[in-house]
């Protein structure tokens, strides 16, 4: 009787870990996409500033 609940608990913990890992992976992917977008925005800002400087000269 004791063995059944413990194995059930172990399975539950493993499933929970799997869920946490998949959520973490999704979070990291979303974070990478956000960083890429931010870098693109920064790049376009820098390029427009550079063209402004060149047009002033």
Curated annotation (Swiss-Prot):
Disulfide bonds: none annotated. Pfam families: IBV_3A. The keyword Signal applies. Keywords: Host-virus interaction, Inhibition of host innate immune response by virus, Interferon antiviral system evasion, Signal, Viral immunoevasion. Residues 1-23 form the signal peptide. GO terms for biological process: symbiont-mediated suppression of host innate immune response. InterPro entries: IBV_3A (IPR005214). Involved in resistance to IFN. This is Non-structural protein 3a. It comes from Avian infectious bronchitis virus (strain Beaudette). The lineage of its organism: Viruses, Riboviria, Orthornavirae, Pisuviricota, Pisoniviricetes.
């Amino acid at each position: 009787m004791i063995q059944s609940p413990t194995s059930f608990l172990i399975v539950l913990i493993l499933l929970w870990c799997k869920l946490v890992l998949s959520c973490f992976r999704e979070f990291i992917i979303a974070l990478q996409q956000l960083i890429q977008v931010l870098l693109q925005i920064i790049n376009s800002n820098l390029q427009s500033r550079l063209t402004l400087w060149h047009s002033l000269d």
